């Protein structure tokens, strides 16, 4: 299907220094959506993909009209720069001064954790996309928080499916903040047979992995059986190149495994043919009308395929529009919450459902095996099988 280009949406951009109190007067004919994300900072690439997907998703879900129940959708964009204090302040400004009815974001788990209490203070929904840490819908959760993005447990359980086995020794290499630590914790809980022999945590902006990888090698080199390093890493300086340069498989029989990633990061996956893991999204995997629309329209508009976080942004937009359609455009928080709890909606990944217990979107993950295809600059994650929501016992970690 095809819709006319985006013409009718008003976008208001903001940074930390903008958005003076009362700068925007709310109209009854508008639905105001704040999108707080990393337009700059260490996760800039992720944030920009989310924004692209979100705008495409609004276009798709509204049939190109950018309205719901006769009300214009107004998106107020704010750059948190990947900094928790800025994200917290911007969300308060969005709810308070900009009169946002609902907010989406952020990119970083650290920023998200700072923003959660703001949603509770203003009693307005924050739809988290794409921040991953379990604690967002776990011990730090409040009832105003929904999430379309996957959580650490969904990453971990699906990767455990791909890696777990008798006699397998696993070392983890992760960033030393909420995303990395929650990811490792969830992965350890998900393993049934394999044993964790080492956990390595490095600063987010690490570019020299020599010492960290050496500690992993020292812990693993004499272990019998299959040996795997699981990488849990976000941002522009992933360790895959450093791992490939050491040729650990050939020298020491140590495999590398990881989840999906953005296409530029997956260029280094080409050095690991046969590597297995589980991904949230790769444009060539899901076969459904929503993904077909996304791929076709993204190619048409940008001459490239949609990336990992583009799908997440689109999923968040579809969820919002579907909820607003069901309320007849009513943005009252209580009505939206009742509508969204248990709500199912179609996304580029397939069907998602907001679990009533913690508002986490239950969704499929995709077990892949990397193929070095000369037609692509990146290692292609070929589908082994879809891991459906009912196969993953995703823990409920919050308290209501």
Functional labels for PLM-detected ranges:
Residues 240-314, 325-327, 374, 380-400:
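Extracellular/periplasmic periplasmic-binding protein-like sensory domains
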Residues 1-32, 399-400:
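Short, low-complexity disordered leader/linker segments with a strong preference
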Residues 94-107, 127-129, 170-174, 223-239, ...:
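Periplasmic-binding protein-like
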Residues 30-32, 45-52, 60, 64-138, ...:
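Beta-alpha junction/loop-to-helix N-cap segments that form part of ligand/metal-binding clefts
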Residues 136-143, 208-209, 262-274:
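Glycine-rich, charge-decorated loop segments at or immediately adjacent to ligand/cofactor-binding or catalytic sites
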Residues 325-338:
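Short, charged, surface-exposed loops that flank catalytic or proteolytic processing sites
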Residues 86-89, 134-135, 142-246, 284-293:
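Extracellular/periplasmic Venus flytrap/periplasmic-binding protein
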Residues 31, 273, 341-400:
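Solvent-exposed, acidic/polar segments of extracytosolic/periplasmic ligand-binding ectodomains
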